[in-house]
Structure formats: C-alpha cells, structure tokens
Amino acid sequence: MVEPAGTALVGVAVWGQNLYNSWRPRKVGIYGAAMVGKTTLDRYMTTPGEMEEIPDEERTGHMRLLGKYLLPKPTRKRISWKGDRRVVFSADLGGQERFWSLWIDDMVARQVEVVVYMFDERAFKGGDEALQQIAGFKYLVDCIINRQYRYRTLKSRWKGKKYVPRLIMLVANKADRFFDENAAMLWQQNRIGEHKVFDPFRDDLVRLQKAGVPSRRSFMATRIGWNVETTLIDLLST
C-alpha cells in the first residue's frame, strides 16, 4: 500500500518539474540545407497557424561585415501542447553552403543544448539537392566530433573547448510528402528511425553514437503544423 504522504511528495515533485520545464529557457540550434523548412519552423514556433509557402526571394540570408557573415540574434518562442509548455530561444540561419560555418558559430557561442537538423524528402531522391542535405549533416557531425569550432570571442573560445550539444535531433520535414503505409506502421510501433528517409544519414548517426553524442529521429510537417509541438516538447523533456 502506498503511503498518502509519499504519494503527495511524488505529486509535488512532478508538479515542480513540470513548472521548471515550462519556464526554463532552452537554447536550441536549428540547422539544415536550403529550403528544408527552417524558416517555416521558426515562424511557426513564433506564431502557430496556417503557414504560407515561403518564396525563393525570401530565403534566409546574412549580411557581411569585415569579411564575416553576421550572426542573427536568437528570438524567444513559447511552445504549448496539451498543457505542456516550453520556452525556446533559437535563430533563423541560412542553409546555403556559405552559411554552414554560421551554424557552428551559433551553436558554440550560445552553447545550445539541443541541435535540430532538418532535411526533407529530396535527401533520398539523388541529385545536387540531396548531396547538399547529406553533406550539411556530415559537416555538422564532423565539427561536433572533432570540435572543429570557430570562435568569435574569447568567451566562446573558453566555453567551446569542452562543449558538446546534449542531443542531436534529425528531423525529416515535409512528412506529408512521403508519409506512406510503411511510415504509418513504423509510427504506430515507435520505430520511425527505420524508415528509408533516414538511410542517407545512418553512417553519420553511427559516428555520433560512437563519439558518445546521443541522437534521435522524428517526422514533421512544419507548413501544416503536424507533429511540431509534440516533437519539440518531447525533445526538451529528456
């Protein structure tokens, strides 16, 4: 028989943990190649709702100063889903190859605890777009494993020497374009990591595991708001 006092203490502890998770600011880095949905996710986290297809001319870019691209400042978002809440600070970074070094600068300078790498169905269709998405993840993994960080300040250099993100989340975005019967079955069985959409990234996921960096996988469809809040709240509860 469970003692009432013990039950009450457990309830208070759970309530306290939920309250802590609801208000603690979480630093999240959202990276990925061009046109995979990073800006859509950034806008959706800021204000959920019906999202437009972002035109090419509005793709994220960055100004240069003295030969360096300027890092955008992170903005605060508040994510809510069925009573759970999280406060997230993230920045919208470009996905073109010339901006990849900014991912690392942002990650190290802010000491992000969770990295979300986004890709879409083009990654397993071949061609230049697939190569960019796969190469972007490999670049990110190389930098994390080998700690090939660039430091913009002495403070970031001091912090970066021992820095490794707590978790890497590989997100297959635009799931509405590839979610088939097999995906539905794997989803129900909590085995989505076995879906073929993740095949191009498996070697680098293994490298992360061997290096002691945990990784997870998920589906999203940011433009229609499917599985966005669920994924992020679950990610920030671990």
Each language-model region and where it sits:
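Conserved GTPase G-domain signal focused on the G5
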Residues: 37-38, 178, 218-238
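Short acidic, S/G/P-rich loop/turn micro-motifs used as interaction or catalytic elements
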Residues: 36-37, 96-98, 121-126, 175-179, ...
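Switch II (G3) loop of P-loop NTPases
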Residues: 83-103
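Conserved C-terminal guanine-recognition region of P-loop GTPase G domains, centered on the G4
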Residues: 114, 119-209
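Conserved catalytic network of the ASCE P-loop NTPase/AAA+ motor domain
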Residues: 71, 79-84, 106-112, 150, ...
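Glycine-rich phosphate-binding P-loop
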Residues: 26-52
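Short, flexible boundary segments at extreme N-termini or domain junctions of P-loop NTPases and their
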Residues: 1-33, 152-153
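Switch I (effector-binding) loop of TRAFAC-class P-loop GTPase G-domains
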Residues: 46-87
